Amino acid sequence: MSKPILSTGLRWLWLVVVVLIVDLGSKALILQHFALGETVSLFPSLNLHYARNYGAAFSFLADKGGWQRWFFAGIAIGICVLLVVMMYRAKASQKLNNIAYALIIGGALGNLFDRLWHGFVVDMIDFYVGDWHFATFNLADTAICIGAALVVLEGFLPSKQKATA
């Protein structure tokens, strides 16, 4: 028996589109206006720096010959399918989980597009303190991390709040 889409968590899929537009738009600007390795200081402790990531987070498996591109693409597709199913099964009123899932899906699809189109993920945000630099990342990574943090947060909320959060 099918449910009306707007009564499910799929009502929040618009957020996936927003994340994709912002992420892919920022990456397109970097690709058009930056040379590989170029850095522009925005604020103290924050640069724009064009980097290519052939692996996963923190360039994990980046030097493994190319198979990792398809491995991580498969993982992204699997996670997106799983989260869409979870959103379909959830009520639209379960805002926190549905927003979290939409952020993760949007970020995963943004990085998936890069992997399939370019063969690498475009990274550009360079956060640093003194001489210590955090791994360069992008807006898709940010959406995924915020989504994951919201899933963890939801796990700590009392049951009554979970139904309306």
Curated annotation (Swiss-Prot):
Uppermost EC category: hydrolase
Transmembrane segments: 12-32, 70-90, 102-122, 137-157
Pathway: Protein modification; lipoprotein biosynthesis (signal peptide cleavage)
Cross-referenced InterPro entries: Peptidase_A8 (IPR001872)
Major subcellular location class: membrane
Record Pfam families: Peptidase_A8 (PF01252)
Compartments where located: Cell inner membrane
Family under the similarity heading: Belongs to the peptidase A8 family.
Protein name, per record: Lipoprotein signal peptidase
Originating species: Cronobacter sakazakii (strain ATCC BAA-894)
